[in-house]
Every structure is written in C-alpha cells, then in structure tokens.
Amino acid sequence: MKKLELKCRFFEISIPYKEETAFWHKQNVELKIEYQEGNSIGNFSIRKDNVEPEMIREEWKKLKDETESFMLGMMYLGNKKVCSKEDELLYSNNGEKFSIRNEMDIEAIITRSKGEEFNYAYLELPSLVCSGEIQSSPIPLPHKMPYVPLNLKRYILTITQAERLDDYCENYEAEQLKLWFLILEELESNKKDSEYHNIKCARDFVSHDVCDRKDPIEFLKIKLPSAVYTESGHEKARFCRDDKLHIALVSKYQSKARCRARKLVKQEIEKYGGNV
C-alpha cells in the first residue's frame, strides 16, 4: 500500500487523561500520551492511504492542516498552552519506507517509483524534552477526534490568549473581558439582549481611562453607583483596579462573557463540521 504518514509530538497537554491512547479510525489518527516526571507528551500520527508519489506534496499539506485543526480542538478543550513539533513525514511504497525532509526527498521518491536510481538520505530525529505541568483529576480522552476548521483559528487563539491570563497571580479579568468581547462583537446575533448590553457596558468601563458614554454610565449608576462622579456638569466613571467593588463587577461580567463567547465559538465549530 502507498501510504503517507505524518508524525508529530504535542507538548504541554495540561489536562490529564485517563487513557494513554486514542484511536480515531475515521480520520486514521492515533494519539499516545506519555507522562514523564509530571510532564506530558502527545505522540500524534495521522495517515493517508493510497497516495501516489506525485500527490505527496498536496497530501502533505492536507495532513498538516488536519494536524493543526486537531491542535486547535485540543486548545478549545482546555489545553491552552499546547504546541506541536513536526517530527517525521513517512512514505511507504511496496514495503519500502522513506523519511521525507524536503523537496529533494519527494523528487527522489517520484524518481524511484519510475524505476530510476536516486541518492536518498534518511532522516534522523533529535530528541525533544517537554516542560508542561499536569493537573489532577484525569478525564477520558474525547470519544471523537477534536477538530476545529482552520477558518475559525482566530477565535481559538483569542480564547487561549484570554485563558492563559488565568495563570497569573495578578488580576487580569479586565483584559480577559476585552478579549471575550472581541468574539461576542463578531459572532453574537442578538445584540439587543440585555446580558450582551451589560457585558458591552462593562467592557466600555474598563477600556477607557475615563468613561463618559451614556450607556455605560446608566449601567454603572445601577450596578456600581460609587464609580460614577460628576465633573464640569458631566457624569463620568473611572475603573480602579485597586477597588474590590470594581474588580467584583468586572469579574462577574468577565465570567458571563467567557461562557457566552465559548458557546458561540462551539456553535461555529459545529456549523463548519468540526468537533470539540
């Protein structure tokens, strides 16, 4: 069988899983997770069968895209720091196995398939070290392969950018609120909804040195009256990071925005045939 196989290693899989191996047969994908001194490495393999030598370049690109879609799916599921290293591209033809490093190797395989001789160098892989952290309470690996269409990549990157701020001891919920709202502003269809309105007002409150627009001022007069003051006859508000009441308000609407944004992104993923 003429087979093309891409092998990668995924690092910093922060969610612990009960199983060490998953087979997603529909996609010809295998994932094996190794735990080493509190760190995790995901050995990932994706295969395409019946690939003629002339089609290696095209199918390689497809396998790389499928691998990136898998990584985005894992990121959505909570592995916010996961990253990959492409280790090896293998091509099998009539019992022979070739490691592909570059265009010359592909040309060598094509030439060899025509019965001509061509010098071919096999690839030797360097050893890699992972430096992630493992949490407690293992969960099952997904029943279906996590998959996010690449046209939705920007939403996953925004989600992970926001969720990585959870890892700092400082409070960055104001910054998280702004990031979540980027998703809401684009994907939310019901912008007249009261919760969306309140999230937007909270976002406006933390986004400006001095907030003086009517909607956020009216919102704050109800939710946080102490933040509103009058200057030169105009009502204004200023976000203070050291005020516990201000932080509590932002935390409340950051949480609401997070839930809403993740739900909207999941709907988009399913709409375009993905799975998380």
Each predicted region: which residue ranges?
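Charged, non-catalytic interaction/linker regions at domain boundaries
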Residues: 1-175, 263, 271-272
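Amphipathic, oligomerization/interface secondary-structure segments
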Residues: 2-3, 138-276
